[in-house]
Amino acid sequence: MSRGQTEGSQAMASSQAAGPGPSPDAIVSVSGTVQKYVAKKKKVLNPEEAELYELTQAAGIVIDQEVFKILVDLLKMNVAPLAVFQMLKSMCAGHRIADTVSADSSSISLAPGHSDVRGRNKPNPTTSTTQGPGERSSREGSSQRIPRQPSGSRMQKSSSSGKSSGGSST
């Protein structure tokens, strides 16, 4: 037998003699690793971000600190909130599909997701003053696109029927 095999067999014999549970040395090293991980995780957020993170938890939002840090960094870089939301939605799409397949209720679980998106885009008198400029500009852009389509249809209608109300000249 080689020296490595002898040490391995001695370690196995000592662990069997100690009992079926893990040795105290293993527990100490695992708890030390966990403590290092927790300390590292706590250092992820600066004090201001940590306060925001605590507020999100108080609001009932469960999110990993590292994911929260990424979101905060994106928003600090002036990435549009809608773009961040769409990115998160696309990243989570795989998880939702797996969840719905396991639950066998794909139509029920997908329906609230679509209604949430539509509900957020509706103008709300209480939140209309707090909306960011990105959301307003997207609404303005869509309102600019809407008149182009009816103008083409008006011209087709007026040329086909030969009747014109004359109101479109102003």
Curated annotation (Swiss-Prot):
Pfam families given in the database record: MOZART2
Polar residues composition-biased segments: 123-132
Annotated spans, Disordered: 1-26, 102-170
Key words, A-Z: Cytoplasm, Cytoskeleton
Signal peptide start-end: none
InterPro entries reported for this sequence: MOZART2 (IPR024332)
Subcellular location: Cytoplasm, Cytoskeleton, Microtubule organizing center, Centrosome; Cytoplasm, Cytoskeleton, Spindle
Stretches with biased composition (Low complexity): 8-20, 151-170
Chief location bin: cytoplasm
Domain of life: Eukaryota
GO cellular component: centrosome; cytoplasm; gamma-tubulin ring complex; spindle
Record text on subunit structure and interactions: Part of the gamma-tubulin complex. Interacts with TUBG1.
Family statement: Belongs to the MOZART2 family.
Protein name according to UniProt: Mitotic-spindle organizing protein 2B
Organism, scientific name: Xenopus tropicalis (Western clawed frog)
Gene field: mzt2b
